UniProtKB/Swiss-Prot annotation:
PROSITE patterns: SYNTAXIN (PS00914), T_SNARE (PS50192). GO terms for biological process: endoplasmic reticulum to Golgi vesicle-mediated transport; intracellular protein transport; synaptic vesicle docking; vesicle docking; vesicle fusion. Gene3D superfamilies: 1.20.58.70. Residues 413 are extracellular. Belongs to the syntaxin family. GO terms for cellular component: endomembrane system; Golgi membrane; presynapse; SNARE complex. This is Putative syntaxin-5. The chain crosses the membrane at residues 392-412. Keywords: Coiled coil, Membrane, Neurotransmitter transport, Transmembrane, Transmembrane helix, Transport. Residues 257-290 are annotated as: Disordered. Potentially involved in docking of synaptic vesicles at presynaptic active zones. GO terms for molecular function: SNAP receptor activity; SNARE binding. It comes from Caenorhabditis elegans. Residues 1-391 are cytoplasmic.
Length: 413
């Protein structure tokens, strides 16, 4: 082991060459040694050389051992050529890369598909024995597609209802909504029917989600619950906006009625006799009538005046009745909307309470997880302390062995 062939030393030397080589005798039996070495000293020196050798030196020694074994197997005629080829190959492997990278390892393969199928079959039989009936995949996909389509349709109808609500709010915020009263009533009835239909559809979606959640307990059920809660909250916001729009419309109608009452009370004076401002015109008309009839007396047709006054009174009464009827219809619509909003908010409250229970369970689980993490941290700290103590013990044992080895080598050689 002390005679290595062409050992490449990485020690810097003052000469021009970067590496120093040691010649190796390929036939050590025929070499004449000038000095005899004791067997014990030779063994100790060999052991010291092995411990002091680097990884490259050990690799080169393994190369030489491989070359020597190859030489004994081949004939004497091609020994030099084969030796040079092997040495060049091994040197190229040792210099240009890891030799293991150039080795192609082929592992035996075996088809275990039948074993996998048998395992799956046994699992299905075990589940059937326990009373667990797995839901077919196509049924799960169809239910998921149905839920997504229903939720998508509800969301689209909600957006359309919001657009109608904005238009209704524009009509209701106008100061004089007498001309748009028919449009406001029409849009109010449409929005009310839309809110009622959306509430029913969301109820169906909630029942569908509860039915699906009973069959599975995973993240998909939680996602379904969140979708239902989101749609219900959007519908509640739409209902709240509808209620505010109806209140604005009612206030506008009340202001319009007050304004009409003010003007009607101001116009009640000319119903009987003409006012002083128009006295000259009336007097001129009477004079013209006198001149036409050729009479010096003044005659007033009291029957015509009473008929005109009764007609005006009937018209005002009819308009008042129409306004009262419209207002009663509006109030009935508002009351119905408020009752429907109460139902919607009650459903939303139930959903929020369910989510609150889920959040409470999540909070408790988080607390348990934090407690487990603290316990795991304490265990890891304890394990680290044990490892550090064992490491120090290993260092002490290794130091004692090294001291014993050095003393043994120095004093016994």
């Amino acid at each position: 082991m002390s005679d290595f062939h062409n050992i490449r030393s990485r020690r810097r030397i003052p000469e021009a060459s970067s590496y120093s080589t040691v010649d190796f005798d390929y036939d050590p039996d025929q070499k004449n040694h000038t000095s005899a070495v004791a067997p014990t000293s030779f063994a100790y020196s060999s052991l010291t050389t092995v411990f002091n050798a680097s990884a490259s030196q050990l690799w080169n020694s393994a190369q030489e051992a491989l070359v020597s074994s190859y030489d004994t197997a081949e004939g004497t005629e091609s020994i030099d050529a084969d030796r040079s080829k092997v040495v060049e190959t091994l040197e190229s492997l040792s210099i240009f890369g890891n030799p293991l990278d150039h080795i192609i390892i082929t592992m035996p393969s075996r088809d275990r598909t039948s074993e996998f199928r048998a395992t799956a079959k046994s699992y299905e039989m075990k589940a059937a024995a326990n009373g667990i009936r797995p839901q077919p995949k196509h049924e799960m996909l169809s239910e998921s597609v149905q839920f997504n389509q229903l939720a998508k349709r509800i969301g689209k109808e909600l957006s359309q209802t919001c657009a109608k609500m904005e238009k209704l709010a524009e009509y209701a915020k106008k100061k004089s909504c007498y001309e748009e009263r028919s449009q406001i009533d029409h849009l109010s009835s449409i929005v009310k029917s839309d809110i009622t239909g959306l509430n029913k559809q969301i109820g169906q979606l909630q029942e569908f989600s509860k039915r699906r959640a009973g069959n599975m307990k995973n993240q998909n059920s939680g996602h379904i619950q969140l979708v239902v809660v989101g749609l219900q909250s959007k519908l509640a916001n739409v209902g709240k906006d509808y209620q505010s729009v109806l209140e604005i419309s009612t206030e506008t109608m009340k202001a319009e009625k007050n304004r009409r009452d003010k003007f009607s009370s101001g116009a009640a004076v000319p119903m009987g006799l003409p006012s002083s401002s128009s006295g000259a015109n009336v007097r001129s008309k009477l004079l013209q009538d006198d001149e036409q009839h050729g009479s010096s007396s003044i005659a007033l047709d009291m029957g015509a005046l009473s008929n005109m006054q009764s007609q005006q009174t009937m018209q005002q009464r009819d308009s008042s009745l129409e306004y009262a009827q419209a207002r009663s219809n509006t109030m009935a619509t508002i009351e119905g909307s408020i009752s429907e909003l109460g139902q919607i908010f009650s459903q939303l409250a139930s959903l929020v309470s369910e989510q609150g229970e889920m959040i409470t369970r999540i909070d408790s689980n988080v607390e348990d997880t934090a407690l487990n993490i603290d316990m795991a941290h304490s265990e890891l700290v304890r394990y680290l302390q044990n490892i550090s103590k064992n490491r120090w013990l290993m260092i002490q044992v290794f130091g004692v062995l090294m001291v014993f080895f050095v003393v043994f080598v120095l004093f016994l050689t």
